[in-house]
Amino acid sequence: SKDIKKKIDSFLRSLKARNEKESISALDISDKKKCFVIKIKNKYKNYYFEEIGGTFFTFIKKYKNIKEIDLLADSLTESKEKLPKLFSEFIFGFNLKSYTFTKYKTLNKEKINKKINLKVISSFKEKIKNEYKYYNAIKEGVFLSRDLVSEPPNVLNPKRYTEEIKKLTKLGLKVEILNEAKLKKLGMYSLLGVGQ
């Protein structure tokens, strides 16, 4: 609506006038809606958008009732060719930061596993979606690794670990499991010592 646009424009002007140092600022639009403004540097290095995505997730965590965020991708003044990659990196950083290992926690699971739906609004939505497939595959691998290293050793022993890794063959990954005899033949005695 015109009122909301007016409120946001006024907020942006005040941020500019104050020369706000913070990279993320929030504005209450109504009781149920907030507007977040993310300042992007003119010159940035690799992984900058990934870092900003993670920073944004940390920032919004303090707002307990947020369930969905509309991300206005076209508001960034970057070339049309760069936008899909930059926003994919932002979403990737946001999702990586959202990881939690709560399998053994007795707290309210619904509360600690609260997901925030990130909805991208852009004329390049399909390109962002296609670009993100690459980052999503990495994210899934990172989350699997984090899950495995977070398991206690009495749960994730060598046998159980091989069972988990074998599941990756469904994705087309070739997996070779080395038994004790093969490990000895290859001289992997340190590994055998750890797995006892």
Report residues per predicted region:
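Short amphipathic alpha-helical segment within the helicase RecA-like ATPase core
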Residues: 1-196
